[in-house]
Amino acid sequence: MDRSLNLLDLALGFDEQLAIPSPLNGKVILIEDCVETSGSFVLHQLMKRVLSSNSSDALIFLAFARPFSHYDRILRKLGCNLATHKSNNRLVFFDMLMVKCSDGDQMEDNVSAVAKLFREIQETVRKLQSVTSGNITVMVDDMSLLEIATTGSNSDHVLDFLHYCHTLSSESNCSLVILNHEDIYASMERPAFLLQMVCLADVVIKAEPLASGLANDVHGQLTVLNKGISNSGRGSSRNKLQNFQFRIKENGIDYFYPGCRS
C-alpha cells in the first residue's frame, strides 16, 4: 500500500497507483456529523487532496459556517496554503456568512437568491474549465446553514439548489462535497432535501462518537458507504461499507481499524 494513502482514501476509491482521473470525479460526497463528533476534519482532508501540488484540480468553496481565515489557519497546519491557491485561481471562495434570505411573504426573492447563487457557481465552473484540465470540486460547508438561511419560506429552495448542483456535477463532471449536521433534525420530521441528499450521494461519510463511549486516544469513528466501487474493470459496481476509527492531531488525522491502533 502507498504510505501516502490512508483508510479514508482507500474507502473513497483511491488506490496505490493514485489513478488519474480521480475516482470522485462527477460524484456527490455527503459528510454527515453530529454535535458530539464534528465531520469538519473530513472536509479539510478533502480540501487538501483537491489542492495537492501533484494535481491541477480546482476548488469552489461555499462557506456558510466559517470565514476564510478559519480554513486558511487549519489547512496551513496540514501543509496547504489556501491564500496561495486563491491567488493562483485554484481556489474560488464564496463567503456566505452574511447570506440571509427573505421572510416567507417574499418567496420570489428567496427563489431569486438561490438561483443567483447557482448561476455564480455555474459561471465559475465554466471559467475554471477554460483554464484547467483538472477536476473541479464544489464544496458546501454546510448545507444545514443554507437551510436555516431560507427559514421562513420553505426548504424547497434548498432542494432546488441541491438539484441544480447535482445536475452541474453530472453535466460538467464536477465533484460535489456537502457537509450536513444530521442531528439538528432529530426532533422533527426529516426535510425532503435531507432525504434527497442521501439518495443522490455516491458516497456517504458519517462521523459518529464511539459506541463504547469516550476515549483519550480515539476521537470517534467513520462509516463510509461508497455506492460506486468498480469491480476490477469488469464494468460493474458494488456498494462498499467500511468502518474505522480516527484520532485528530494538530497537523493531521490518524485512521485505524478498531483495536489496531499502535
Curated annotation (Swiss-Prot):
Any one biological process term the GO annotation gives: regulation of leaf development
Domain of life: Eukaryota
CDD domains per the UniProt record, alphabetical: Elp6 (cd19495)
Record localization: Cytoplasm; Nucleus
GO CC terms: cytoplasm; elongator holoenzyme complex; nucleus
Tissue: Expressed in leaves, stems, roots, flowers, siliques and guard cells.
InterPro entries (UniProt xref): ELP6 (IPR018627), P-loop_NTPase (IPR027417)
Main location (coarse class): cytoplasm
Knocked-out gene: effects: Narrow leaves and reduced root growth that results from a decreased cell division rate. Higher resistance to oxidative stress mediated by methyl viologen (MV) that blocks electron transport during photosynthesis and by CsCl in light. Accumulates anthocyanins.
Swiss-Prot/TrEMBL keywords: Cytoplasm, Nucleus, tRNA processing
Pathway recorded for this protein: tRNA modification; 5-methoxycarbonylmethyl-2-thiouridine-tRNA biosynthesis
Job description of the protein: Component of the elongator complex which is required for multiple tRNA modifications, including mcm5U (5-methoxycarbonylmethyl uridine), mcm5s2U (5-methoxycarbonylmethyl-2-thiouridine), and ncm5U (5-carbamoylmethyl uridine). The elongator complex catalyzes formation of carboxymethyluridine in the wobble base at position 34 in tRNAs. Promotes organ development by modulating cell division rate. Involved in oxidative stress signaling. Prevents anthocyanins accumulation.
Quaternary assembly: Component of the elongator complex which consists of ELP1/ELO2, ELP2, ELP3/ELO3, ELP4/ELO1, ELP5, and ELP6. Interacts directly with ELP4.
Family: Belongs to the ELP6 family.
Database matches in PANTHER family: ELONGATOR COMPLEX PROTEIN 6 (PTHR16184:SF6)
Name this polypeptide is given: Elongator complex protein 6
Gene label: ELP6
